[in-house]
Amino acid sequence: IAHEVNNTTAGITSTLDTVEQALSSEEGMEDICDVMRVCTDRCFSMSRFITRFADVVKIPEPTVAQVQLNELVSMCKRFMEGMCNDRNIILRLECDPEVGQVRLDASLFEQVLVNIIKNAAESIESAGEAAGKQGEITVRTTVPALIEIVDNGPGISKETEAKLFSPFFSTKPNGQGIGLVFIREVLSRHGCAFSLRTYNDGLTRFRILFN
């Protein structure tokens, strides 16, 4: 699996680099080139992650460093924007400028945030037009060091909430229940407190608090 993933990401990054170089001299292409660089960085991050994962045949232990939390969250938001746009979901970013650096493994945390946003988008999409409202996801940081991903999807029942982080439990028809277990393990290894539930205002919040 690692071999196939790395071969694929290598091909993608090579193509992105070629296209970026071709467009970089064109007027009005700055934003497109910027998005391409974000995608390239994400491919490299995925390659590093899958290689480390395969080396130990388990979730790798975090290799932590000081990371600017707002920059990490902003990058993930930009990476997931296209997927949300395709689903007619508005993806917002609200970063508190007072939030500073935290010690974390950037590659692992990128995977966590991508999984959370993807799950929120799929939840909103599952409700479809029956929900009768615009789908929205907000990624927010607040002091001292909190990440909150909020969505206005159909919500989570108390019964489901109690099972969410159990292996092989999934609310998706073809789900394998691996994503949330991965998230749980990574957050636990970082010493983070976290929760996922639907509140009385009808919004579902995934909260991650750094110690």
Region annotations inferred by a language model:
Residues 1-211:
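Core catalytic ATP-binding domain of two-component histidine kinases
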